[in-house]
Amino acid sequence: MGHRIPVTLGNIAPLASKPFRPGKLALICEGGGQRGIFTAGVLDEFMRAEFNPFDLFLGTSAGAQNLSAYVCNQPGYARRVITRFTTTRDFFNPLRFARGGHLIDLDWLIESTAARLPLSMSSADPLFEQGKEFFMCACRSDDYAANYFSPTSDTWLNLLKASSAIPGFYRSGVDIDGVSYQDGGISDAVPVREAVNRGADTLVVIRTVPSQMYYTPQWFKHMERWLAESSLQPLLNLVQHHEESYREIQSFIEKPPGKLRIFEIYPPKALLSSALGSRLPSLTADYQTGRLCGRYFLATIGKLLVAKPPLRRHLPRINTPGPLVISPVAAANESLVKPISPGLQANDAAFDNEDLA
């Protein structure tokens, strides 16, 4: 059996990790709507530390959006999209939904961010030229089969839309090569098994819910209120399919097969944010939690994955002393009688910057 190492605030398991050979390294990001603000915080810390040793990237829904910002090296991008765009009535509008429109307007979101906050897609080219791969998960509308798409500059935004098209909330699926697709979370909310199928030996998984948490999606509870009874049965079938898939994924993460190693980064408790309709203070708090978890990962596990420790250490500024002034008072210039006792660490050969983490 493989190894699962939980990484969250208050859990000391990462501190016991010893050096190892990661092999092919994959980064997998779970969806979760606005709860993806936690993932944004983790990845912003990774980018701040210039930490990107990964060979493979896999994301679903909000996870695909966060990874897009990461591979394009745009720190703060995902946070701004979530806090500035997904909190507006142009995007999330229950009244519009009650009148027959979309509850979430992905068309508006994609068009608005492309115009006002575009992805720097060309910045990802150097990664892809090195052989690194990025896949977004979306599910077919007819049989819910999960498919994985590698974006190009021409297909990137449409793939993001497809991966995030929550059934019922975005009433129409997204067309890809003549086939209708919906949210990848239906069948593969955390594409860890696909990463293994693509040869990954070590997985870093960023979750948007506490580990080992099983839940009925909040959005389905809303749908029960808003949809007619005749429309509920197909949706109920979809939710049952999603829950079965989610349990299988959770079991895979808890008990990795073979020699697989999984580092699971997750919030220490349920986030304040919801998938939709979150308030800005909640999003801000969850973003900060993500940054703290990202820092903890870098200080414990991250340094095992790269040759150079990823954390930057900011040394205090050295002030150049001014000219020496000799006091005319005789006592002020007397030699010190007692010897100076240096700090213990001054003669400790084992003491270095690593002790400052």
Name these PLM-found stretches:
Residues 59, 63:
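Gly/Ala-rich beta-loop-alpha elbow adjacent to hydrolase catalytic centers
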